[in-house]
Amino acid sequence: MSMKPLGGSMASAEPEGDIADPGSLDPELLGFMCGIEIHQQLATGKLHSRQSGMLYDYTIDTIPEDWPRAQRRLRASEGEAGKIDVAARFEAKRNRSFIYVKSPNAGLIELDEAPPLSHDSDAVDISLTVVAMMGMNPVPVMQAMRKTVVDGSNTSGFQRTTLIATGGQVETPSGVVRISLLTLEEDSARKLDTQSNSDGEVVIYTLDRLGVPLIEIATEPDIKNPEHAKECSRALGQILRDTRKVRRG
């Protein structure tokens, strides 16, 4: 059986250059293949509740003691296919419980005690603006999907994600990078601390960040080298900043 380079781009099976000096190696001759995925918080209200998207800069030592707290355990259950997710089963065996600190911008939806509301209209508008800036194709219907999250950072046990558009591209000095998809999803709760007691491990989260909208952008593996990856990241970041409606640290 013979081995051929992918796409015929590699001249030989051995790297050309000094392997002790990675900077001297040609990424394309090595068969370098790269795509990137980025997440950007939006400066809006929460995605599926009408709560404020304000973030509180508290630590486990400074968070107000009078903020309500709820303690939960996540239980692995069967999905639509009638099977229990392997990661969920593993997490259940860790015997961890979770304490959620209810910030002023957290309500019944953040506590998973009420059904989610429709998408925040401002978050959708910003997403569609970015879609237009990259020449993407919006989907005809927005349908929230559920991604299993078993580390306790989502009170419901899953993250709501909505596909907004596919296709499109971004221009860089080293060439065009195709965009695979853009989704709109919820950020997770913020972890404050992990403690141990006689009953096992207790993880403490605050709910201020849970539900804040995130734009997720994924590219195709068109990036040619590390410098090209930097250019692509910068181009995507500039597009998002040009909306004037994203959060910046």
Give the residues covered by each predicted segment.
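Basic, nucleic-acid-interacting segments
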Residues: 2-249
